[in-house]
């Protein structure tokens, strides 16, 4: 009983709290100046009146769905009887930033709720401040720890900061974003600060460091604001692999060009067979030119060789480039032959290789199939006859000779031989079939099925050939003995022979 009473009291208390509570939508409204918005306060029962106070407005708005007395502000909601008190603001002003208060009259008392209205203000242009100082000429030396700070002032809400190098994410070490608040003419604004740092390398020279702010007020027509700084780095000539120059003509003046990177401009000297040729000088057939600036800290270095000989192509040309930060040695080889082809394969070559491999695999599969089934080149060289001949032509000759001899000398012995041959012929297809079955056991299921199909066809063909041969043997035995007599034309015995390869009668 006490449990039921407790549940009832809890339900009543919950209902009372629900009625006494004013729900708001949204809790916080983040808007740009000039935006339109709707703010709503709700109660669980019917209300008598709806009053709303908006920062920056001189009077309290008494709103109802039945009238609209203040331009730019109208009632919003399903009606007072539904317990809803809301306002629709046509254009939000910067002075409206703050807390919007709604007051609802309920059965002789007044309930209230608040909504945070944040009107965004675009921050000032970002500023990059260098924490690491360059030299008088604005250069940093290679290996220096570069540090910079980006500040985005007076934004509402605070702006976010991101770093880029040449329009790519910097991916350098940064400090957490720091937000500082300040008040100006009773308006609270925020300033965002972040630092970035890393050790400089030659690749960082002439690159653009960008600090970009991201804010609520950014639009397609109003892109994010940013600040930029060009980093200048001094470094010794950059090492690179040995160079090779191809396509030079013998007995002509050869021009050898090498591109190197350095900051500031390097001094050049060539060493050829122990002889040193400085920039802007000529020594015999060798002339070294002044480095030519190409941009982005790159310089073109040229050596001219008058009357190039075959011996010149066997030499190693040593180049030394130096500036105030260090020196670097390079080795250059030259050749009168054309540039060697690239070792990489093009698309056509790859396709050709794939097709060739596919064809090779297909041929191997066909050979394996033919060998397993005894087809094509792996089949028998002749069709076996009841007398076990090895070839069609030989069988015809042997048939003629054996027939003539058997009719004159063998007599009854020939009959027993024929019976023995008939038994051998009956056993032969069975043995062949067993051999084929043994082969089929070693094959996959699909190959075994194909093999059985071929065996059935071969068995039917063999039976037909056997019946035809039996008829031929019967005909030969019925030939009278007078056929063994000597003919007056050629004085040789005659025999009628059935050719197994072609179904015709021939005379021997």
Swiss-Prot record:
Pfam families: C2-set_2. Residues 381-439 are annotated as: Disordered. Residues 21-346 are extracellular. The modification Phosphoserine is found at residues 382, 459. Residues 371-508 are cytoplasmic. The keyword Disulfide bond applies. GO terms for cellular component: adherens junction; neuromuscular junction; plasma membrane; recycling endosome; smooth septate junction. It is found in: Membrane. Gene3D superfamilies: Immunoglobulins. Glycans are attached at residues 160, 257, 300. The keyword Chloroplast does not apply. Disruption phenotype: RNAi-mediated knockdown in the neurons of adult males, significantly reduces survival to 57 percent. Adult survival begins to decrease from approximately day 14 post eclosion. Pan-neuronal or glutamatergic neuron-specific RNAi-mediated knockdown decreases adult climbing behavior. Glutamatergic neuron-specific RNAi-mediated knockdown also decreases activity throughout the day (during both light and dark cycles). Mediates cell adhesion in a Ca(2+)-independent manner. It plays a role in axon outgrowth, guidance and fasciculation of the developing nervous system. Function in neurons is essential for adult survival, and is important for climbing behavior and activity. This is Fasciclin-3. It comes from Drosophila melanogaster.
């Amino acid at each position: 009983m006490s449990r039921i009473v407790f549940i009832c009291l809890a339900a009543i208390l919950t209902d009372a709290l629900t009625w006494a509570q004013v729900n708001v939508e949204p809790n916080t409204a983040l808007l740009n100046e000039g935006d339109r918005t709707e703010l709503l306060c709700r109660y669980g029962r019917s209300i008598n009146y709806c009053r709303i106070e908006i920062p920056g407005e001189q009077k309290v708005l008494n709103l109802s769905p039945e009238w609209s007395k203040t331009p730019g502000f109208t009632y919003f909601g399903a009606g007072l009887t539904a317990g809803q008190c809301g306002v629709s603001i046509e254009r939000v002003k910067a002075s409206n930033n703050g807390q919007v208060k709604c007051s609802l009259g309920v059965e002789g008392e007044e309930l209230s709720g608040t909504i945070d209205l944040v009107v965004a203000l675009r921050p000032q242009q970002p500023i990059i401040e260098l924490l690491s100082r360059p030299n008088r000429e604005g250069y940093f030396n290679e290996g220096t720890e570069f540090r910079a700070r980006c500040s985005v002032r007076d934004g509402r809400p605070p702006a976010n900061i991101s770093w880029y190098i040449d329009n790519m994410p910097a991916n350098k070490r940064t400090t957490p974003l720091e937000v500082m608040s300040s008040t100006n003419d009773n308006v609270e604004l925020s300033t965002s600060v972040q630092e970035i740092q890393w050790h400089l390398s030659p690749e960082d020279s002439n690159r653009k460091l960008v600090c970009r702010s991201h804010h609520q007020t950014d639009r397609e027509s109003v892109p994010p604001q940013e600040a930029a700084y060009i980093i200048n780095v001094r470094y010794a000539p950059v090492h690179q692999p040995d160079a090779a120059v191809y396509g030079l003509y013998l007995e002509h003046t050869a021009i050898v060009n090498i591109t190197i990177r350095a900051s500031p401009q390097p001094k050049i000297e060539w060493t050829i067979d122990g002889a040193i040729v400085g920039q802007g000088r000529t020594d015999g057939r060798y002339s070294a030119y002044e480095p030519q600036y190409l941009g982005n800290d790159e310089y073109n270095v040229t050596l001219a060789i008058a009357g190039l000989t075959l011996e010149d192509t066997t030499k190693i040309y040593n180049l030394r480039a130096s500036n105030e930060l260090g020196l670097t040695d390079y080795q250059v080889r030259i050749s009168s032959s054309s540039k060697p082809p690239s070792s990489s394969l093009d698309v056509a070559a790859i396709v050709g290789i794939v097709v060739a491999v596919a064809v090779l695999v297909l041929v191997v599969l066909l050979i394996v199939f033919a060998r397993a089934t005894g087809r094509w080149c792996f089949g028998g060289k002749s069709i076996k006859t009841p007398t076990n001949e090895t070839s069609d032509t030989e069988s015809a000759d042997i048939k003629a000779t054996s027939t003539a001899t058997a009719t004159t000398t063998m007599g009854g012995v020939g009959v027993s031989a024929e019976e023995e041959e008939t038994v051998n012929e009956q056993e032969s297809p069975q043995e062949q079939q067993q051999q084929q079955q043994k082969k089929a056991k070693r094959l996959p299921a699909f190959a075994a099925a194909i093999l059985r199909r071929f065996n059935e066809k071969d068995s039917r063909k063999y039976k037909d050939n056997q019946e035809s041969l039996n008829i031929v043997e019967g005909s030969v035995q019925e030939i009278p003995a007078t056929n063994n007599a000597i003919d007056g034309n050629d004085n040789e015995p005659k025999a009628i022979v059935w050719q197994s390869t072609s179904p015709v009668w021939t005379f021997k």
